[in-house]
UniProtKB/Swiss-Prot annotation:
Name the record gives this protein: Uncharacterized protein YhcN
The family this protein is said to belong to: Belongs to the BhsA/McbA family.
Predominant localisation class: periplasm
A Gene Ontology biological process term: cellular response to acidic pH
Lineage, opening ranks: Bacteria, Pseudomonadati, Pseudomonadota, Gammaproteobacteria, Enterobacterales
InterPro entries registered for this protein in UniProt: BhsA/McbA_stress_biofilm_assoc, Dodecin-like, Stress_YhcN-like, YdgH-like_sf, YdgH/BhsA/McbA-like_dom
Origin: domain of life: Bacteria
Signal sequence interval, chain numbering: 1-22
Organism: Escherichia coli (strain K12)
Amino acid sequence: MKIKTTVAALSVLSVLSFGAFAADSIDAAQAQNREAIGTVSVSGVASSPMDMREMLNKKAEEKGATAYQITEARSGDTWHATAELYK
């Protein structure tokens, strides 16, 4: 249940605009019409969901992705997120 709450919170935050990012966070319906090009994972200690989003954006940009979908997220004292990348 905690994972679903974290993913839902990240999805809501990804809809809000906090500056220019190279890759857009998308949902499962939007991902169906795109070409998957790989996955990335990020992790950290004691940081905010926005830090996770910024790290995912940076990795997506480095891989040449225009969008990503968060497929897994865990939080607590340490956190981890995995995202599928799309063109």
